[in-house]
């Protein structure tokens, strides 16, 4: 049996550990976060699985990789002990009258990037049938029927409980840099044995890997979570706006996660007043029922990004780094982990050869 050491327990650390165990391997996790994962970007994310709408503002590869990830979510989630909220109700892209030019620009880009059957333009009657409450404020929309989202809190809890049962999961201080020497010292001090016990090490630290990935940077995102008993939106919604295009993802029990901001900053301070006002104003403009919603959380985090905004898997002398998921953790995480597992399966039984 191969034995892997996972450094980090955010979304990618959890996915990697879970899939390695399901493949029949042993896993040890070392992480500076708590087991609930409350300090990870994936814990506060909207967790939309939106290969088509994301590709429109990125490139075709996001669509193609995202479709592969979506198939993996379909396959993997039923393996958990309890169901995870995973509505496959699509995404509606809308704009207010003054921002119709933004929607038209988005549609032209979609026609260039996507296939014709990836989305459809719907009129007021079709929107009324699909989402009556959204039709109260909008007369048309672009509909992406194959998109979805999942409840990241449920997922974190379910996978966290699984990993607690099936791994040796230790909490440690943050590690600034990974080398054979620092890993050997870490193993001796924390686990009481040599690094050589492990087939390979997988670095899943996200922003924690900055000292080792010189081109990695953090991109700040700000997210609200609200309880809105007067709102019954079933689809994910994207609101076009020239400064802060907003996305909204439903959760069980009339909860919604709302985000918009992509700020080139590594500031982890609380949500700014300006961002909160813009988010709440845009939210109210989508549905008047949000006027009486209760704000449950305002959170900010920094998502790890590389210059091309695409994820990477890099081999090191001690193992692999998987990083740079940017705002696409839930969209591209599964396919990246699947690629990593393929690389690991191609290793010889001796695994990565540690330098002396």
Describe the role of every protein-language-model region.
Residues 15-23, 48-49, 84-86, 200, ...:
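Active-site substrate-recognition segment that forms the wall
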